[in-house]
Amino acid sequence: MIQSHVSVMLNEMLEALSPKAGESYLDCTFGAGGYSKAILESCNCYVTALDRDPNVIKRAEEIQQSYGERFDFVETNFADSFAKLKEKKFDGIVLDLGVSSMQLDIADRGFSFLHNGPLDMRMSGQGLSAEEFVNAAEEKELADVIYKYGDESFSRRIAKRIVEYRKTARIDSTSKLAEIVRSSIGFRKGKIDPATKTFQAIRIYVNDELGELEQFLVNVKNILKKDGRLVVVSFHSLEDRIVKNFFKENSEKPVVRSKYAKDDMTIDPNKWLKIITNKALAPSDKEVGLNIRARSAKLRAAKAIYE
């Protein structure tokens, strides 16, 4: 059964973004449009949405019909969006780094071990597919990718089993890969599926998700107005670490000054952010109970204090 997409930490995102009438916002990961729609409904503002997945265009057109000129969609990944945005600046930017249920639950996309389909996993349908990677990579490279991007302690065992299997048959479906992983480390009922981390790791690798996030953050200052807010929802520790470090490196530590101090404070233009969330916010127990895919989400937000 295909699960309809439920946006994660929607209320927390809106509170952190704080949309205002007349202002412009950038939804960098449109997906099923949950964030874009919520922002548009919150006040009489404008939203530009980005996504590299051509399968979401129909949903974007539906939202455009409802909100007219207040909504615009650009087919691109967020790392390559700067040229297409043509130096436009925004009052707020939001990134939801998770894979939408719409992508996970369609078997032909090859993202999920729960639905048998071709082993693809490409967001845009272009570039190296998961099938090509799994069937061509050396055992060490497979192990390194599964360990680095999936934090999988059994990565070497899984990689060895993959290489052994493909000597007899090509690994061309999600079910085949999932069974190989499960047989490598065992499957205990009631626990998180053993294939979870391996599928996550391969998806991150073939889509260069961490590289794109880092590239976007390096350039985001150029499209965020003064006092504009940057809100990021991540779903695993590698993403969260990148966002946390970026916020830390580009923000001043709070300084308590005496009201009698006479010297002027030194302004460092490289410290252009003020962190809004001192610690990453997590979804409520109630939300996780309603949507298990929210369990690993973390939200961080910061505000631009200089342009």
From Swiss-Prot:
It is found in: Cytoplasm. InterPro entries: RsmH, SAM-dep_MeTrfase_MraW_recog, SAM-dependent_MTases_sf. It catalyses: cytidine(1402) in 16S rRNA + S-adenosyl-L-methionine = N(4)-methylcytidine(1402) in 16S rRNA + S-adenosyl-L-homocysteine + H(+). S-adenosyl-L-methionine binds at residues 33-35, 51, 82, 96, 103. The keyword Transferase applies. Keywords: Cytoplasm, Methyltransferase, rRNA processing, S-adenosyl-L-methionine, Transferase. One of its GO terms (molecular function) is rRNA (cytosine-N4-)-methyltransferase activity. Pfam families: Methyltransf_5. The keyword Cytoplasm applies. One of its GO terms (cellular component) is cytoplasm. Gene3D superfamilies: Putative methyltransferase TM0872, insert domain, Vaccinia Virus protein VP39. Its EC number is 2.1.1.199. This is Ribosomal RNA small subunit methyltransferase H. It comes from Rickettsia africae (strain ESF-5). The lineage of its organism: Bacteria, Pseudomonadati, Pseudomonadota, Alphaproteobacteria, Rickettsiales.
